[in-house]
Every structure is written in C-alpha cells, then in structure tokens.
Amino acid sequence: MKFDMSAVILTMGDRPGALKESINSIRSQENVNVEIVIVWNGLVPNYSVDAETHVHSDVNIGIPAGRNLGASNTSEKIILFLDDDAQLISNDLLYRIKRLFNSDDSIAIASLRIIDEDGLTSRRHVPRLGSKSEAISGQTTGFLGGASVARKLAWDQVGGYSADLFYSMEETDLSWRILNAGWKIFYAADLQVEHPRTEPTRHSEAIYLTFRNRIWIAKANLPFILIPIYILTWLGITVARNLSSSKALLAIFKGFISGLSSSPLKRSPLSWKTVARMTKLGRPPII
C-alpha cells in the first residue's frame, strides 16, 4: 500500500483502551493512507494492536529516544506524533495537515491544538507567550510533542530529539535547532486533538529533570551571553512556583547543580539572526 504519511505512537502499555481509540482515530481519517508505527517503551510488543510496524526497547529509554526510535522506522515524508491517550477529532484532519505541509515547504513542525474532554484548551498547551487566543494560528517558537507533525527532511537535518534529555524540555531543544536551521514552526489552531485534562507535573523527579535539562539545553544552544540570563530567569520562575514545597525546592537545587556540572549535549549556539527572529515571534530565548 502507498502511504501519504506516517504516525508514531509511543506507549508504555498501561493504557490499552486509550491506545486503541488513538489508533482508531487515525484509521478513520479520510483521503489519506497512514503508516502507523507503535513504539513499545520498556516492554514486549503486543502484536495484536493494529499497526504496520511495532518496535520496542527492553527498558524505558525516555520520551525523546522513544520518539526518535519511532521516527527512524517510518517511511514517509510527514510524521504525526500522537500521545497514546490522544485522539484526532475530525476525520479530515490528516488530509488538511497534508495540504498544509504541501502548501508551505518551509514548515518543519506543526503543533496541533489540544482540547480536553470539555472542548477547552489549557493556556500551557498554547506554544507561545502572551494573551493571543488559542484559536489563532500562526508561527511560533515551540510546539507540543504529543500532538505534533514533523517534516522528515527537517527532522533528519537536525537529528531529531536529544535522547539524553530523557524527559522534559526536548521540544524546546528541538525547536531551537529547527529554527536555527531556517525552518518554521506553525501552530495550527484549527487542527484539533482531544487529550484528557491533566495538571502540570509537580513531583520532585519531574522538577529535577526539567530544571537540569533547562540548563543543559541553554549551554548547548544559546549564545554565551544569554545562558546566565535564561538560567536565572527560569530559576526565579521555578522557585516562585514551588515556594510552598521544600521537596520541590530541593529538587530545583539538585537540578541546578547537576545541570551546571554536566554537559552531555553538543554545543551549537543559535545565531543572532535566529535570536532576533524568535524575539519578533514573541518569545526571545531568555524565557
């Protein structure tokens, strides 16, 4: 069968019902044939699940490495990345994505609009700063990995996600590298994905990894003069958000020390042209 695009779903096998619904929402798409790749992260594949390709890792390799594994096993030029508990809402969504990517070959990534079971979009799910409505499409400086579409050419050019990040900040890191390579990131407000309402992760391990990874990506991607500005800005924001929790504050401190004392990511700083472009788009790489 000739496919129009690929879809990658990363799963740890703990939501079989939701995974089936995610796959069904892809299979129900009209006017497109989709190659589905399931990545079984840390477990043996369930080959009865409907997919063209099943790949797996014996241990939990993390979100970025898991999605990289899926992408490396796709065959098409456009790749949908979908959380295993998310569903495409309309049956023509992937056809419209195909048209979007065909209409502008400078788009590397499209971030889809996430709505919850009540049809609402959380502010943290809109990949831009400011009060601009979640219903307005446009270029952005970031995207949401579990409801996104990537052009394989751009993905391969920059090397996909940084696997060392394991959890958190991988989208920001990839966004910076995509923009620095001259590509666009587009928030498509009219292309909607339903995902159950969730609260921001506040447990200590997530806080630790997020802050450590912020420092790692800053040291890898930012011009030297911006590195301390970015780190100190986010130190202030993160501490302010977690003042009531001593465990969270300890996790921030540990992440700060770990991030400063290690640098696993290859350094390739943003050009000042890219910094200016990001600033014009409303999010300079200091926040």
Please give the residue ranges for each predicted region.
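N-proximal low-complexity "stem/linker" segments adjacent to membrane-targeting elements
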Residues: M1-S25
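Cell-envelope/extracellular polymer assembly enzymes that use nucleotide-activated donors
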Residues: D4-S6, E35, D173
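Short, acidic, metal-binding catalytic loop of nucleotide-sugar glycosyltransferases
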Residues: N24-N33
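Glycine-rich, basic loop-to-helix element that forms the pyrophosphate-binding segment
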Residues: L43, S57-T74
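Short aromatic/hydrophobic "clamp" motif used to bind/position activated sugar donors
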Residues: I79
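Conserved donor NDP-sugar-binding/catalytic core segment of glycosyltransferases
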Residues: N91-S122
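A short, conserved alpha-helix in the catalytic core of glycosyltransferases
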Residues: G142-A150, A154-G159, D164-Q192
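Non-catalytic, C-terminal membrane-associated alpha-helical segments of glycosyltransferases
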Residues: L209, I225-I287
